[in-house]
Amino acid sequence: MSCAEVMYHPQPYGASQYLPNPMAATTCPTAYYQPAPQPGQQKKLAVFSKMQDSLEVTLPSKQEEEDEEEEEEEKDQPAEMEYLNSRCVLFTYFQGDIGSVVDEHFSRALGQAITLHPESAISKSKMGLTPLWRDSSALSSQRNSFPTSFWTSSYQPPPAPCLGGVHPDFQVTGPPGTFSAADPSPWPGHNLHQTGPAPPPAVSESWPYPLTSQVSPSYSHMHDVYMRHHHPHAHMHHRHRHHHHHHHPPAGSALDPSYGPLLMPSVHAARIPAPQCDITKTEPTTVTSATSAWAGAFHGTVDIVPSVGFDTGLQHQDKSKESPWY
């Protein structure tokens, strides 16, 4: 047996390398021969070593999983078990004092909410106070808008301005600056004796009824007076015809009796009925009384009628009367 045969054992066909015999290498150091490994063989060796490492790593992980499962099974077992009846068994898994654990849990939760969101807690507290602050500011602004007399106990709301003229004896009390019945300047009936134009009526704005509809029916007498001075004979029959038409007081038929005190003095005098006599006898007296009343009231003051606010009714009647004359 040669030295080469001793060093190299026979290998099957296709072996990648020959491993020397250590005994032969010691006896024949010169005959020791180890061929260089090829690149493909190195890759195979690296893959094999990695597989062994992965197997070694997975084995302890499986053991850890098994240990954890065993611990969970032990935890799932109830700490106490109480038999209530044949169909009910009470298992208690909690170990320790339940009350102390619950208190600790809620105190910890509340403490974390305050420490994590301090701004939100402050904003919520402000939001709870803002409606009260807004209400107080709104009340203070409203209090400043009203007069001081409104907040006193002796304050009384002022009456409507039109109530002062319902009756001359009716007294209206109110704070200064409101309408009073003692001041006759706003009413047009008290200004007819003046020669200059009367101031505009300030109370007519609050009166819902137009003044022309109240006094316009009685202006036929004034028209008769006016036509008597300018056309004494040409239209006498027309005046008598109008007189027969207005024999009964026209203002009383057109107006409600409750509006009687609101009329002017001359109109109020014209509305007083004459004694019940013959029509032919009362005709001159009625014409004379109405003519004298209107002539005395409107002596030199016919031009002030448009300033009082009766121009619309007068113009309308003048246009209706001019059609048969001209």
UniProtKB/Swiss-Prot annotation:
Keyword annotations of the record: Isopeptide bond, Nucleus, Transcription, Transcription regulation, Ubl conjugation
One GO cellular component term noted in the UniProt record for this chain: nucleus
Region (Disordered): 57-80, 175-203, 233-256
Composition skew (Acidic residues), residue ranges: 64-75
Subcellular localization, as worded in the UniProt entry: Nucleus
Pfam families the record matches: Vg_Tdu
Basic residues bias spans: 233-249
Cross-link (Glycyl lysine isopeptide (Lys-Gly) (interchain with G-Cter in SUMO2)): 62, 126
Entry keyword annotation includes Nucleus: yes
BP term (GO), one: regulation of transcription by RNA polymerase II
Tissue expression per record: Enriched in placenta.
Signal peptide: none
Domain of life: Eukaryota
Membership in a protein family: Belongs to the vestigial family.
Function: May act as a specific coactivator for the mammalian TEFs.
Name of this chain's protein: Transcription cofactor vestigial-like protein 3
Species, as recorded: Homo sapiens
